[in-house]
Curated annotation (Swiss-Prot):
Protein name: UPF0227 protein YcfP
InterPro entries: AB_hydrolase_fold, UPF0227, UPF0227/Esterase_YqiA
PANTHER family xref list: ESTERASE YQIA-RELATED (PTHR35602), UPF0227 PROTEIN YCFP (PTHR35602:SF2)
Gene symbol of the encoding locus: ycfP
Domain of life according to the entry: Bacteria
UniProt cross-references to NCBIfam families, sorted A to Z: PRK04940.1
Length: 180
């Protein structure tokens, strides 16, 4: 089972395309939708939905995957639910760059202070990070500097922020998923 979390643009047709591409790895791909505008509510909702899916799951090696803001959530929810994560161009600093787009961007900073201390150290090697060199929305170099101590970083030379085509990375994602 692969759980997919969309980014800020929840209505993007690219979400459906990514789900179809992920089905080459595992036919059981589930998209969880969330508001993107209310961080504390989103966190509760995502934890509840992922937990529900894991309770009914028969896959011994589930994976959670997210793009942009969905990558922010996939890393945290995956850690809290003890499943591996794959994140594409994660938005690690939504409290800095989401002002005017969501109701309370400061809630992201608050969530960070309430998260498990040093969670990335405890999550070491359980997350695969795929970054675009052509990310027009986020500073991928800053993201790499923040995460490379803990996770493998894969650079993509073609894609933009929304990462429309993930197919060149499917084999690596499949191998990462099988590590469980």
């Amino acid at each position: 089972m692969i759980i997919y979390l969309h980014g800020f643009d929840s209505n993007s047709p690219g979400n459906h395309e990514k789900v179809l591409q992920l089905q080459f790895i595992d036919p059981d791909v589930r998209l969880i939708s969330y508001s993107t505008r209310h961080p504390k509510h989103d966190m509760q909702h995502l934890l509840k939905e992922v937990d529900k899916m894991l309770q009914l799951n028969v896959d011994e090696r589930p994976l959670i995957c997210g793009v942009g803001l969905g990558g922010y959530w996939a890393e945290r929810i995956g850690f809290l639910c003890d499943i591996r994560q794959v994140i594409f161009n994660p938005n690690l600093f939504p409290y800095e760059n989401m002002e005017g787009k969501i109701d309370r961007p400061e809630e992201y900073a608050d969530i960070a202070t309430k998260c498990v201390t040093n969670f990335r150290e405890k999550n070491r090697d359980r997350c695969l990070v795929i970054l675009s060199r052509n990310d027009e929305a986020l500073n991928s170099q800053r993201t790499s500097e923040e995460l490379h101590h803990y996770y493998e970083i894969v650079w993509d030379e073609e894609q933009s922020h929304k990462f429309k085509n993930i197919s060149p990375h499917l084999q690596r994602i499949k191998a990462f998923k099988t590590l469980g």
